Amino acid sequence: MELQARYDLCHALIQEAGALAQGYFNNLSSLTIKSKGLQDMVSEADLNTEVLIKSRIAAAFPQDAFLGEETGVTAFTQGQGIWVVDPIDGTQPFVSGMSNWCVSIAFVRDSVVQF
């Protein structure tokens, strides 16, 4: 039941975060983009989408750890569940106006991907 509740949250989050990211995608001309390094970038869409996902997960499952591409990892112990998030998987295509990007969310426990 506990895993099902996480799966249900994940499903809802993908829709909510996807809608937020799509709003930015539809308004690319006003999007702020920064370089994270050689051939690596982050946009305000990445950051804000990850913050949304992270806050919803923390509210529902405060005992779980979080690893986000943009915000990093929270404290994590062996056996603890961890959410692994790439808020906009495919930032380069996203900022280039190409539609081959997505919101990626996984939940891992005991080194096994649960979903």
Q: Where on the chain are the PLM-derived regions?
A:
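N-terminal subdomain of lithium-sensitive/metallo-dependent phosphomonoesterases centered on the IMPase/IPPase/PAP
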Residues: 1-88
